[in-house]
């Protein structure tokens, strides 16, 4: 088994488990088993944002881990190419299922574009990256939204022409946690948290590690499985 940083797998596993939980709540609402505004309540909205933050933070940290010393182009295009293709497929499938509420620029789209931007930032030190993240966060706070703008700019920032979407993560502000992840690399390395291991965990954390290592696959298949499960339940009852 290749060496990995186990705590990152654990955090990613917790994040994907949280995402499945959130989507299960969405399905309960969608199929009429919960009140129609369930996931729009403040606590659920916060939960959703925490999940997105964690995925983007880990993605930024992983970019620095893999490419800080030198850019491994083969690894980069394999990882981010697959992510981008999956993002496009999700847009197509959600358009077929939900039409105008399709996912146009969701979490995978944000990770893909942030990865490209991140390549340009790899040589910045941690302090510079941190200040850039803070600047972008403040920019998002002080820019009045939605901005007057057309449909094309929805990938960058929320505009007056941005339609409804089941998952929407525009670059401003959602590149911020990605850059914070990049900025944290040197700090975590200083604290000795970047040590790799090929040790297999044989306790309750092993499931979380497995979920973390297979997070993209789980992300892609969990919602279809949940949907089919709900449809079968409705048919049987």
Language-model regions, residue ranges each:
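Alpha-helical transmembrane segments and their immediate juxtamembrane cytosolic regions
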Residues: 1-237
């Amino acid at each position: 088994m290749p060496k990995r940083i186990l705590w990152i797998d654990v955090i990613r596993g917790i994040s994907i488990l949280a995402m499945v939980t959130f989507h299960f709540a969405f399905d309960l609402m969608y199929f009429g088993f919960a009140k129609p505004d369930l996931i729009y309540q403040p606590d659920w909205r916060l939960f959703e944002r925490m999940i997105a933050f964690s995925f983007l933070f880990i993605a930024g940290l992983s970019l620095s881990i893999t490419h800080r010393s030198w850019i491994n182009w083969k690894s980069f295009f394999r990882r981010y190419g697959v992510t981008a293709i999956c993002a496009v497929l999700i847009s197509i499938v959600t358009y077929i299922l939900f039409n105008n509420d399709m996912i146009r620029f969701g979490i995978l789209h944000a990770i893909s574009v942030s990865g490209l931007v991140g390549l340009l930032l790899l040589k910045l030190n941690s302090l510079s990256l941190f200040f850039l993240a803070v600047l972008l966060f403040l920019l998002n706070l002080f820019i009045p939204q939605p901005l007057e703008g057309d449909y094309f700019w929805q990938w960058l920032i929320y505009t007056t022409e941005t339609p409804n979407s089941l998952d929407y993560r525009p670059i401003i502000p959602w590149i911020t946690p990605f850059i914070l992840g990049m900025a944290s690399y040197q700090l975590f390395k200083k604290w000795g948290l970047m040590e790799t291991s090929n040790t297999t965990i044989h306790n309750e954390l092993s499931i979380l590690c497995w979920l973390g290592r297979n997070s993209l696959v789980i992300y892609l298949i969990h919602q279809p499985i949940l949907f089919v499960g709900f449809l079968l339940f409705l048919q049987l009852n």
